[in-house]
Amino acid sequence: MSIKTLQSLFERDLTKLKLEIESYQDESKIWVIDKNILNSGGNLCLHLIGNINHFIGAQIGKTDYIRNRELEFSQKDVPRTVLIQKIEDTLAVVNQTLNTLEEADLETIYPLIVFEKEMTTDFFLVHLATHLAYHLGQINYHRRLLDTAK
């Protein structure tokens, strides 16, 4: 997959993530869990921010980002404005990082072993884009299901 295509996918879905967080009518519902829904929209948002900043920003872009995965799922009641700023900052990191790459870099081995074996940078970036889309769908469903007046 080309760098431009990857940038387009990340831009599209991080923009949709921002829209989903903005679309909660009741900001407190961003953090609601219910029955078998164990992850709130807010925690999934924090998870995506952490995941992308770690695997793209820190590992490829050499940013100083330090991931705290446990906090992504335990932190609560982060203001919507902070989540939105973090999403915007994450998109900037993705674009800055991908802009430093040449197409040939996509065929190099990704710097970390993530799934117990080596993989190309291209493969892992596609994985990260599909991981983003997967959780984006969960957040959309969370919002439509739980952001209702009762």
Where are these regions (language model features)?
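Extreme N-terminal tail/first-helix region
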Residues: 1-15
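Charged, amphipathic alpha-helical oligomerization/scaffolding segments
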Residues: 12, 16, 47, 86-89, ...
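Charged/polar positions within long, soluble alpha-helices
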Residues: 19-22, 26, 53, 57-60, ...
